[in-house]
């Protein structure tokens, strides 16, 4: 219990009106004397003076609104009648200083905060949570507004075309023209003492009149999220879809090849909803060439935009790699289309001429044998050209699947030949679809903020991990082992793998070779579906993902996922079966384990495959 203080001591501890500066700073009890007792005890009596307090700003209470310091203005944009998207309502609060009462003084600063509301047409009175889209602080500048002057809605500042958060669900071409217009507008001098009135310019203003009908369809399905991160993510995913046909008004034109033209007897349960991506690859280049000739000089402007906005170091441009000029999709021209695919495909040697910095894995291992050599020769390491790697990969897959369909034409039974031909085509479509739908969106989201130095660090991490895996292969010398990049390029092959398959070491490591060249069609299709769905970026619910794979598996004989595969708890390895190509042209059934190695960005950089042959007893 606290001891009661005598009355004399209570008088000395009684609070006073104003304390000295020292007692105020130290938060101790001061007295009315000057100097006070606390300052005398510390021999600082000559510095004892009253603490000056700031004067309170009192607002004169008049009954009129114009004398308030806080001015609110609600501006509703006039939205065209053809659009059904939610209208944009902008609430601007101008926090003016109290110098309206004292015009003789110079104001310190002026702060403008603009909020954006999305209000449904059916509920004009209901508001949503505001989000700040622009925050401007102008020092040494005052915007004095007279509330008696009413500002009409046509003079309001429209932020629907704000370049920070552009409107989504638009084509890549329209977004480019929109950003170019905004960039030119930002270069013009702005007024200093007033808000510049702008008109509600649609996003499609840069397009021709012939495309207005298509733009109206886009406006009807316009979606504007309440989060700038959702808008940014949606635009990235939209670019993946629009990158195939950036100059086509309707993406459905590239899918003119219907399921009825290529009937698949074993895939009848899927109906005609399957998209033939092989024809997409063959027709994209020719259609874009026709569009380029009509657009003319505007294409160079868009290329300039790409250099500013796009990410220059990361690319998955797998849909513009076809050099064929024929995009005819009639069934009678299938043989001509396939011959053009074979004639237009480039060999690995021709593709490597475009990459002057290419070093084969065997030559690189001669330079770098230890981790110390890796860091000593770090100046020789450059980011790997994955764009060229995916170009070679697409050429290899088309050569493997489409040439396989041509070879099977010599079969004795015509029905069996036709079924096998369609299965191979469908397998290639399943592979490309799994890359575009499963792998590409996650990969783009993970690499959106990477710079060139990050790619260099990723390559150094890959080479350092490769050295550790090679040392492990020497310890576990009884298992045939092969290591490849996420693009399928082989980086290391153990001696046991050479003994198992019978291939020469120089054949695999002295050039760009892919692991898919040494697997059959069924194993390649299984690998891409399992890798893109489960192995590349990990998985959470194993049973759910496994069931999803089984349901989405192709119904053709050569594309069914092997039922006997299992997972590890950490999501880095999968056990399954495959058919490995031997040097004599035959395939050997093997049990394999695919283990992925990821970097700090959770991006797969290496895949290690271990193979054990399965000998069946007669």
From Swiss-Prot:
The gene is GSM1. Residues 466-538 form the PAS domain. Keywords: DNA-binding, Metal-binding, Nucleus, Sporulation, Transcription, Transcription regulation, Zinc. Residues 335-352 have a biased composition (Basic and acidic residues). GO terms for biological process: cellular response to starvation; regulation of transcription by RNA polymerase II; sporulation resulting in formation of a cellular spore. Gene3D superfamilies: Zn(2)-C6 fungal-type DNA-binding domain. This is Glucose starvation modulator protein 1. GO terms for cellular component: nucleus. Belongs to the ERT1/acuK family. It holds the Pfam family PAS_13.
């Amino acid at each position: 219990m606290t001891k009661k203080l005598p009355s004399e001591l209570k008088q000395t501890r009684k609070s006073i009106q104003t304390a000295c500066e020292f007692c105020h700073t130290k938060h101790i009890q001061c007295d009315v004397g000057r100097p006070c007792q606390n300052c005398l005890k510390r021999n600082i009596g000559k510095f004892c003076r009253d603490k000056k307090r700031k004067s309170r700003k009192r607002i004169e209470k008049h009954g009129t609104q114009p004398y308030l310091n806080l001015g609110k203005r609600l501006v509703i944009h006039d939205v065209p009648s053809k659009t059904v998207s939610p209208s944009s309502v902008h609430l601007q609060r101008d926090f003016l200083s109290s110098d309206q009462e004292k015009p003789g003084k110079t104001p310190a600063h002026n702060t403008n905060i603009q909020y954006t509301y999305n209000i449904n047409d059916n509920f004009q009175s209901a508001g949503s949570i505001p989000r700040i889209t622009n925050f401007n602080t102008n020092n040494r500048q005052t915007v004095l507004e007279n509330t008696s002057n009413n500002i009409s809605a046509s003079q309001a500042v429209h932020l629907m075309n704000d370049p920070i958060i552009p409107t989504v669900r638009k084509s890549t071409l329209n977004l480019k023209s929109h950003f170019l217009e905004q960039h030119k507008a930002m270069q013009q001098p702005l007024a200093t003492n007033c808000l510049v009135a702008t008109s509600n310019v649609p996003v499609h203003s840069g397009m021709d009149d012939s495309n207005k009908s298509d733009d109206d369809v886009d406006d009807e399905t316009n979606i504007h999220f309440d989060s700038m991160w959702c808008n940014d993510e949606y635009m990235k995913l939209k670019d993946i879809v629009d990158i195939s046909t950036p100059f086509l008004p309707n993406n459905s034109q590239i899918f003119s090849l219907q399921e009825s033209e290529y009937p698949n007897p074993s895939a009848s349960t899927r109906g005609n909803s399957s998209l033939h991506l092989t024809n997409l690859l063959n027709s994209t280049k020719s259609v874009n060439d026709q569009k380029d000739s009509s657009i003319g000089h505007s294409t160079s402007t868009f290329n300039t935009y790409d250099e500013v906005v796009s990410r220059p170091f990361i690319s998955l441009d797998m849909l513009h790699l076809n050099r064929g000029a024929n995009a005819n999709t009639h069934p009678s021209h299938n043989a001509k289309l396939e011959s053009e695919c074979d004639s237009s495909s480039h060999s690995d040697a021709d593709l490597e001429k475009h990459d002057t910095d290419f070093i084969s894995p065997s030559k690189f291992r001669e330079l770098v044998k230890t981790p110390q050599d890796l860091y000593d020769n770090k100046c020789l390491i450059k980011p790997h050209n994955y764009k060229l790697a995916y170009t070679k990969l697409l050429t290899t897959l088309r050569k493997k699947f489409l040439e396989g369909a041509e070879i099977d034409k010599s079969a004795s039974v015509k029905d069996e030949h036709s079924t096998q031909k369609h299965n191979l085509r469908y397998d290639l479509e399943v592979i490309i679809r799994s890359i575009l739908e499963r792998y590409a969106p996650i990969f783009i989201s993970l690499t959106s903020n990477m710079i060139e130095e990050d790619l260099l660090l990723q390559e150094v991490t890959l080479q350092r991990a490769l050295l550790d895996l090679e040392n492990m292969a020497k310890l576990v010398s009884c298992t045939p082992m092969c290591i490849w990049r996420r693009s399928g390029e082989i980086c290391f092959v153990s001696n046991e793998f050479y003994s198992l398959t019978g291939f020469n070491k120089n054949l695999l490591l002295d050039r760009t070779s892919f692991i898919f060249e040494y697997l059959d069609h069924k194993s390649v299709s299984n690998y891409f579906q399992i890798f893109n769905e489960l192995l590349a970026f990990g998985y959470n619910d194993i049973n759910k993902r496994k069931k999803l794979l089984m349901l989405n598996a192709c119904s053709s004989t050569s594309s069914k996922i092997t039922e006997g595969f299992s997972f590890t708890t950490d999501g880095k390895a999968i056990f399954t079966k495959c058919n490995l190509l031997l040097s004599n042209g035959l395939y050997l059934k093997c049990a394999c384990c695919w283990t992925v190695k990821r970097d700090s960005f959770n991006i797969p950089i290496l895949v290690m495959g271990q193979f054990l042959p399965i000998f069946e007893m007669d």
